[in-house]
Structure formats: C-alpha cells, structure tokens
C-alpha cells in the first residue's frame, strides 16, 4: 500500500508528458541502415521514468495481479517497478545457466538458431495471475516464448505490457489471445530497419 501511495502522489504532474521526447533515435546503429530506439534518456529522467511505469501499469491496476514476470535483460528495468506499483511479486525469466534452483524450461527457434528461457519451478504457483512486462514489442518471439513458459507453470496470464510497440513488425498477433498494452507505438517507413535490429544474430547473454 505504501508503494501504491508513493506512486499515486508522483503521477499527477506527469499525466500530459510526451514520453517520445525522451526516446532518442540513433541512425545506423548497431550497423549502417538500422534505426535504434534508445530509451536511456527516458530512464535517466525521473519524471519520464515514473510516467512510463504509471502508463504501463494503468490498464492492470484493478486486475489483482499476483506476479509480474519479465525476461532478461531490459525487461527487468520495468518489471520490478511495475510489480511495486501493482503490489505484486516479481519473477525473473532468464537464459540457461543463470538460475540455481529447479527449473521450468522452454526452447524456441530464432532466425539464426535457437534459444531457451527458464524460470524457477516455485516462482509462480498454479492459478496465480501474471503480467508479462518488457521494454519493447517487435516481432514478439521472446515474449511468445515467455507465454509458453508461463503456460507450463499453469499461470493465469492477464496480459502483456510494453513501453514501446513497433507495430509494423506484427508481434502483437503472435501474442493472441492475450491482452497487449503499449505506451508508445512506432511504425511506418522505419519498420524494415527496426526489424533488422530484432533479427540480428544473438550475442552473449547478460
């Protein structure tokens, strides 16, 4: 309750903030022809960060969320404060070799190979109401894998919340029938460049 009151006392001044002003476009990164959406200015701005968390949480405030789940690494940035805002627990979803206890695992295919996500078997109890959180929805592959992993836990998945949605990449369709909420939507002429970012060969896990 204290966390909810703290957020409530802060959110009113930021209701009309244009968060796009705090997302920086970086052309030709990480290679020529790619446009990168850099959220580090938003993260460094206290009011913008608070407003982002508030807007990501807004549709789920009355949904009685038990657990917020997020995949490494950038999902952790928003997952923990959203859990605090919703008076819920936080459960990390990680790559292999990062979690020390008994695990549920889900392997999935990527354009350049395969990957795997894992969660502790006691992280989510059957029937708990879970919200999945990430900074970005693009092609939807990682979030879809998170959904399949949470289904193995017999969780009740309430929906997914993102700061940014790259609409033209079609990720939302992969998350059907679950409710998808995003704060900022981008699309149009830069869709192919942003698709290139999401499909680049995976690097080492964080």
Curated annotation (Swiss-Prot):
> Where does the protein principally reside?
cytoplasm
A GO cellular component annotated for this chain's UniProt record is:
cytoplasm
Assembly mode: Homodimer.
Return the PANTHER family for the record: ADENINE PHOSPHORIBOSYLTRANSFERASE (PTHR32315:SF3)
Annotated keywords = Cytoplasm, Glycosyltransferase, Purine salvage, Transferase
Q: Which reaction does it catalyse?
A: AMP + diphosphate = 5-phospho-alpha-D-ribose 1-diphosphate + adenine
* The UniProt record lists the keyword Transferase: yes
**Which protein are we looking at?**
Adenine phosphoribosyltransferase
Q: Which major enzyme category is it?
A: transferase
Cite the PROSITE patterns for this sequence.
PUR_PYR_PR_TRANSFER
Instruction: Report the Pfam families cross-referenced here.
Output: Pribosyltran
> What exactly does this protein do?
Catalyzes a salvage reaction resulting in the formation of AMP, that is energically less costly than de novo synthesis.
